[in-house]
UniProtKB/Swiss-Prot annotation:
Name of the protein this chain belongs to: C2 domain-containing protein 2
Gene name for this UniProt entry: C2cd2
UniProt keyword Cell inner membrane present: no
Entry-annotated residues carrying Phosphothreonine: 440
Higher taxonomy: Eukaryota, Metazoa, Chordata, Craniata, Vertebrata
Cellular component GO terms, alphabetical: membrane
Its membrane topology: Single-pass membrane protein
Modified residues (Phosphoserine): 54, 436, 581
Limits of the C2 domain: 241-357
Domain of life from the UniProt record: Eukaryota
Any one Pfam family match given in the protein's UniProt record, by short name: C2
Main location: membrane
Domain SMP-LBD span(s) in chain numbering: 45-238
Localisation: Membrane
Amino acid sequence: MGSWLSEVQWLFLVSLFVAALGTVGLYLAQWALAKARPPPRRRAEPDELRRRESDTLLSWILTRDSWGNQWQAAWVTALNYEAEKRGGPLRLSFQKDPRPQSLQLTVEKVSSVVKSTQEKVVICHVVGETLQFLVSAGPASATGSECQLYDVHLSPFHLKVEFHMEEKREDIQIRWSFTHVPETAIKIQPQAPGEKQALGVNMLSEALEDLFKHLVNAASPSVFLSTKPTQVKEAQSLQCPSSTAQEPCPPKPPRAHELKLQVKNIRVSLINHPGASGLSHVCVAQLNDPEQRFISTLVRNTTDLSWEEEFTFELNAKSKELVLQISQDGCSSEGLLGIATIHLDLFRKQPNGPQTFRLISGTEPDSLVLGSVTAEFSYVEPGELKSWPAPPPVSAAKIEKDRTVMPCGTVVTTVTAVKTKPRFDTGRATPLNSESPVRTPVTVKVIEKDISVQAISCHSAPVSKTFSSSDTELLVLNGSDPVAEVAIRQLSESSKLKLKSPRKKSTIIISGISKTSLSQDHNAALMLDYAASMDSTNQGDATSALCHPEATEASATTPPEENEPAQTLPALKPRENDLDSWELEKESPVASWSGPALQEPDGDELSESSLSTSELGAMKKHKGGLLRKGAKLFFRRRHQQKDPGLSQSHNDLVFLQQPEGRQKKGATLGRLLNRKLLTRHRGKHTMNGVPREPCI
């Protein structure tokens, strides 16, 4: 029994030992597996997330182009300061490498240090691929031409960057320093050394490596980063580099259709003399779009041609080319002296200021060069339009000519001149006008109507009075005088036009003899027969009209709106106040109305004429007789007897055929004045309250 218990006890102890060994082995196996297996990822803490955000922000700041330009320039300044401070027999001068280089900076290990409640420092380590410098090395006593230029490369490079931020400051000070690591390689290589100097330069390069390491480690450059809040436009302007070496930021493109291009002071310098003397040259400036053309004044043939005129062009988005043509006497391509083509850049507003261009013989690029053209260009924006000096007031004149050829061969010409009030001419030149805005001449408008043929009866008729649309009293002689009737018709038509602010209106009526004889002019002969037939038809009506001149109304020559019952004309016994008005008016009208436009260009012989007084200003209507101020007067001269062999006028022929008693005395101005003087002594003789002329 005792032996059996001892065996059981031994087996139990052995089992416990084996179990202990198994447990130890299991733990060892789990430990080995845990070592071999990668550690599980832990959930990111909030601090790590903030750190990643700060790394991204700093990386974005350090990759900006403006930052790269500033920190390289600051580093070059710090290296030159340290080199000058160190001194020694070898003088070093660092420069920024103008060649483009990519600065890819990676931010690592960002840490934050709080120095005080108002200042905070953020420290980070930055790694870059390659950094390039230019260094000029030479003896201290050597001149600039004896120094050798070297290229310095650092790859890779490690920097320690510190951001110093203060609460009351809007700028962040950034400092950095070079961190030396074993893998950083410094390479110094001379630029194109000579064969004799190659050995000495290589030895100097090895000495420069140690010196450069010391200077890089000692330099501590710094810049300021602005954190001031700005508007979008200011932020766009800050993106432009401030360095003068960089190309300036192009301005905002202007609105081309609002710009104006001014070209002035054009001067042409020719290599050779133009040739024949006595010729004049002209400059033609032409823009492609919108098409505008300006022509300068003529300049005598000299070696240096110049025009001081100013041309203003309207521009749009398609304005690309301006052509200056120099030609002789404004001729076409045959007299072309040279062409200068100017390309316009409205985005940069070029050309601007005085510019010089080649003057070539043709439009081809390989044309012969004849000289140069210099002109001054300027761009005017809407708010900068130059205010032209106010020119003196000018008056506008309107001259209207109306010619009528009657069947009898008489030419009746009516010339009416109207001068308006002086006005201020703004001088606004159209794009196709070549005159300077300040040199706008007095406006003269000439209207000349075509010559027409009128078949008018030549019998006497009563005289009546009517008013035109321009408040001008017209004396209507219905049939009594064909010349006066044609003139009244012409004046009635012209008086329909309402003029603005008339100052002076003068009318002259001229009737002349046709230079072509009736025997040579077949058309005039036919019209003569037609007029003779009308004379025989209307003879009865004219005879009755002679006995009753006061009862005839206005004829059909009066405008349609004037066909109202006309007033009976007191032609022979005017009132006393009418004569006084005539005496005040008779001196100035004829003498004041003068000018080359009143001369008859045809040069016809004058056999009979009518004259009217001038109307000064806008006159008011007055109730009165014929000879009042502002009234139009038409009167005839006494018909002159001529030899039938010396006259070709049908009126003269008819006059010679008629007896002396049949000639009707016209109501001339002399008769009117004589009758007026007689009435002062004899009194006024009236019939039914209206003076009338007895039948002749």
